[in-house]
Amino acid sequence: MIDTSVIIKALFSPSHRRAGTTYSRELKTHESCVALLAILDDRGIEVLIPRCGIIEIAAVSTRLTNSSISEEICNEVETSFTIVPEERLIAQAKKIALSEGCPGFDTYFLAISEQNLIPLFTDDLGMHRICERRTIHSWILRDIDLKSVIPDLK
């Protein structure tokens, strides 16, 4: 399970202007996101994304590029990953929202991980902390050592 932050950070290199003093950390995170997606693809590991993740990717990628490229990105995500409809997640996502008060889109990613007992890769520290509270196995990409995680990926 990957959060949209992983997809976006894999696709777009950090900008010196936007990243400022955190540029080196953001560049390392970008490289980790690219490497993670390559590993998942090379190993044929199914990656689940809630349908609403497509909307989040569309919004963020349009801000970073343009709507035409953003649409291409969304189409590629829809063909590369398994899209999970909200109907399969709504009850669990609602429980998570009621207990955690987290952003709405996040609840769908958390629901997939929790329902399917699969780990979540994210670069969203808030989502990672919710995972810790809920005992969802997760990794924060800015701190990850992929070599130590690779044996866990099945």
Question: Regions from the language model: what does each represent?
Answer:
Residues M1-I49, T62-S68, V149:
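Short, well-structured N-terminal submotif of metal-dependent ribonuclease cores
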Residues K9, A59, H128-R129:
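Alpha-helical elements of the RecA-like P-loop NTPase motor core of helicases
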Residues Y23, T82, E114-Q115, P119-K154:
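Acidic, PIN/NYN-like endoribonuclease modules and their adjacent C-terminal/linker elements
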Residues D42-G44, T79-S80, N116:
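Structured helix-beta-strand junction loops
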Residues T62-E72, E78-V84:
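Helix-adjacent hinge/juxtasegments
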Residues T82-G126:
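Active-site neighborhoods of divalent-metal-dependent phosphate/nucleic-acid chemistry enzymes
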